[in-house]
Design a protein with these regions (language model features):
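Structural detector for internal amphipathic alpha-helices that build alpha-solenoid repeat scaffolds
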Residues: 1, 12-35, 45-49, 55-68, ...
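Buried hydrophobic core positions in alpha-solenoid tandem helical repeats
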Residues: 6-11, 39-44, 73-78, 111-115
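Amphipathic alpha-helical segments within extended alpha-helical solenoids and repeat-rich scaffolds
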Residues: 70-81, 122-123
Length: 136
């Protein structure tokens, strides 16, 4: 089995079993062996799942991959909330999502950043606004 297929299998198994530790392990393997575009659909699903604690790692992976297919998931994830991140008044996860959108740098990604810049959370809105001048 190729590295790519092994990573896909690990991520699928982690998601099927809803095993948070397995998500962490699979992401570690993915980063070690190299992220590939074939991971994007699974990463998009996982970034929206609420049963694990690796959302920031997934945002970083999607930022590195810069795949336009991840735009919707990243924009939705930027507005999501997770109990384990309640301590973070700076919304670091949302910030990572806005960086990923900016790095994708398509018209659709910029449009989603504009939408986020109008959201009701002033911190997230500021992150999105800040990304626009850097990429537009």
């Amino acid at each position: 089995m190729s590295d790519e297929h092994e990573v896909i299998a690990l991520l699928q198994q982690a998601r099927t079993t809803r095993d948070a530790d397995s998500v962490e392990a699979a992401l570690t393997v993915a980063f070690q062996r190299g992220l590939t575009p074939s991971l994007v659909p699974l990463l998009c699903d996982l970034i929206l799942d609420d049963w694990h604690t690796r959302h920031e790692d997934i945002a970083l992976a999607l930022e590195e991959l810069r795949d336009p297919h991840s735009i919707d998931a990243l924009a939705r994830a930027a507005l999501s909330s997770h109990a384990y991140l309640d301590y973070d008044e700076n919304f670091g996860f949302a910030r990572k999502c806005t960086w990923a959108l900016a790095r994708i740098a398509t018209h659709e990604a910029f449009e989603r950043l504009r939408e986020l810049a109008r959201c009701s959370n002033p911190t997230i809105a500021a992150y999105a606004s800040k990304r626009l001048p850097n990429v537009a």
